[in-house]
């Protein structure tokens, strides 16, 4: 354990780096406001005294627009129906929620949308009757691939008046793919003849059409869903109201923070302008990177926080919300603690069935590669996603290799003999700073594309060598100390 004064120094330095770099982004946003407004049409509203808003983050704008139109009211309807069903018809609550989910899906996606979800679900259920994991996965991948066929896309576009409706269908089918895959694989693992009626088609529909997670997740495995949905214990009305009030308070704070960032820092518009990105100062470049990943974090606190709140009111335990990215210091931690539901899905249904760590080094490398290949394809399979997946695979592989090396008895004895616990902690943070730099780079590729990643690589690691590179690693060294201390506290709690 490091001295308190040293940890406090690292924390203050980290906060100082954050705020100063954000200030640099704010200045650049103001200086180039007219230029960015002409190119990207910044929005004007009265939320923050008339400040213009960067609305170029498609995902945030998309879900906020749908939320105002339909989703907030449909989610409120789910909450009311669920509470009424719990009070009046508890035994039939899963089927009532299933019917409500179908109706809500019909409200926003129409008959063709509901039919597509039903079609994919039915095909997956029929294939699962063969009790073959291989056939189930081939079926799921085939259904997923149909979402990217140009001819199929054109047909689906003709069903709707706006692009937003088409994209909502695409997002819904993409997330539903993980849900019907989870059910089908769980069915494959049941011994014949299946004694439980939990793996019937009605339960599959109740799982797939559970509305809070229908369009965007988070991911909850069927085994967890069925176990929790069948339990009879539920919170009292008073406890539910407390959960609702606290949850809404947190959601409003997260939403306000995300909107404030979009009004003060035009990071998404600047990322879309590569010539401008190549000319800003290194401080601004660092602030843009921090602002981008932190906005992504706050955005998913909202997007996952809303369904998580409704799941708690329904008596379900949702996956944990993302942990703050400023406390992440490894690829492994990022995957484990950001999208917990997706991580659990990948481990349970991809990594372990392929072989996991039970087949030696090559088996581990292959299982990890297959996991990242699937998650890249599931996200869309674009070039920048394969690059992002490769960087993550390499990062996780190197981290696990270093961890195994350090855990060997010979290295352990040498470290214990020649280095104090404080020195070992500092050495850990130094290694973590290198990993964190690559983690941020991979996240920027995911959020901004290959061109943004290349710009950062050239400016920080090629043109900026040695002083800019070493300065960045020094800043990340402070971040890593904070992250390591946070991780230890998190593990203790």
Curated annotation (Swiss-Prot):
GO terms for biological process: N-terminal peptidyl-L-cysteine N-palmitoylation; smoothened signaling pathway. A lipid is attached at residues 188, 242, 324, 410 (S-palmitoyl cysteine). The active site is at residue 379. Keywords: Acyltransferase, Developmental protein, Disease variant, Dwarfism, Endoplasmic reticulum, Golgi apparatus, GTP-binding, Lipoprotein, Membrane, Nucleotide-binding, Palmitate, Transferase, Transmembrane, Transmembrane helix. Pfam families: MBOAT. The keyword GTP-binding applies. GTP binds at residues 448-455. Residues 1-5, 85-94, 120-131, 184-202, 218-243, 311-363, 400-427, 482-493 are cytoplasmic. Optimum pH is 6.5. Residues 95-119, 203-217 dip into the membrane without crossing it. GO terms for molecular function: GTP binding; O-acyltransferase activity; palmitoyltransferase activity. It is found in: Endoplasmic reticulum membrane; Golgi apparatus membrane. Disulfide bonds: none annotated. Inhibited by NaCl concentrations above 150 mM. Palmitoyl acyltransferase that catalyzes N-terminal palmitoylation of SHH; which is required for SHH signaling. It also catalyzes N-terminal palmitoylation of DHH. Promotes the transfer of palmitoyl-CoA from the cytoplasmic to the luminal side of the endoplasmic reticulum membrane, where SHH palmitoylation occurs. It is an essential factor for proper embryonic development and testicular organogenesis. This is Protein-cysteine N-palmitoyltransferase HHAT. It comes from Homo sapiens (Human). The lineage of its organism: Eukaryota, Metazoa, Chordata, Craniata, Vertebrata. The gene is HHAT.
């Amino acid at each position: 354990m490091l001295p308190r004064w040293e940890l406090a120094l690292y924390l203050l330095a980290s906060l100082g780096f954050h705020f100063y770099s954000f200030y640099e982004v704010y200045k650049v946003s103001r200086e180039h406001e007219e230029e960015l407004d002409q190119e990207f049409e910044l929005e004007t509203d009265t939320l923050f005294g008339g400040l213009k808003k960067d609305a170029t983050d498609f995902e945030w704008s998309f879900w906020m627009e749908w939320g105002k139109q339909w989703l907030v009211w449909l989610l409120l309807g789910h909450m009311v129906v669920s509470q009424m069903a719990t009070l009046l018809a508890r035994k039939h609550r899963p089927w009532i929620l299933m019917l409500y989910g179908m109706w809500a899906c019909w409200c926003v996606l129409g008959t063709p949308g509901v039919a597509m979800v039903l079609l994919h679900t039915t095909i997956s259920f029929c294939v699962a009757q063969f009790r073959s994991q291989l056939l189930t996965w081939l079926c799921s991948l085939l259904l997923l691939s149909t979402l990217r066929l140009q001819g199929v896309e054109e047909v689906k576009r003709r069903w709707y008046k706006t692009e937003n409706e088409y994209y909502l269908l695409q997002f819904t089918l993409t997330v539903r793919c993980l849900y019907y895959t989870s059910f089908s694989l769980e069915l494959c693992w049941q011994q014949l003849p299946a004694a439980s009626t939990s793996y019937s088609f009605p339960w599959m529909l109740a799982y797939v059409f559970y509305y809070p997670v229908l369009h965007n997740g988070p991911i909850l495995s069927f085994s967890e869903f069925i176990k929790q949905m069948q339990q009879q214990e539920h919170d009292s009305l008073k406890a539910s109201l407390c959960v609702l009030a606290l949850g809404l308070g947190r959601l409003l704070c997260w939403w306000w923070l995300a909107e404030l960032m979009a009004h003060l820092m035009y990071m998404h518009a600047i990322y879309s302008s590569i010539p401008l990105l190549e000319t800003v100062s290194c401080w601004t470049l660092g602030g843009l990177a921090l602002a981008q990943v932190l906005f992504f974090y706050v955005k998913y606190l909202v997007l996952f926080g809303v369904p998580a709140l409704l799941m708690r009111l329904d008596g379900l335990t949702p996956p944990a919300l993302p942990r703050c990215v400023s406390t992440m210091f490894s690829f492994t931690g990022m995957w484990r603690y950001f999208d917990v539901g997706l991580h659990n899905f990948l481990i349970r249904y991809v990594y372990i069935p392929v072989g996991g760590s039970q087949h030696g080094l090559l088996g581990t490398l292959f299982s990890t590669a297959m996991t990242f290949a699937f998650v890249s394809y599931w996200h869309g399979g674009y070039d920048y996603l394969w690059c992002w997946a490769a960087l993550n695979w390499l990062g996780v592989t190197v981290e696990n290799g270093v961890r195994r090396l350090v855990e060997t008895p010979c290295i352990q004895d040498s470290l214990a003999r020649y280095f104090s616990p404080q020195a070992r902690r500092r050495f850990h943070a130094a290694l973590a700073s290198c990993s964190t730099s690559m983690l941020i780079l991979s996240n920027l590729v995911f959020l901004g594309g290959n061109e943004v990643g290349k710009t950062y690589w050239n400016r920080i690691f090629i043109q900026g060598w040695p002083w800019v590179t070493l300065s960045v690693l020094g800043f990340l060294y402070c971040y890593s100390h904070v992250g390591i201390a946070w991780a230890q506290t998190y593990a203790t709690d």
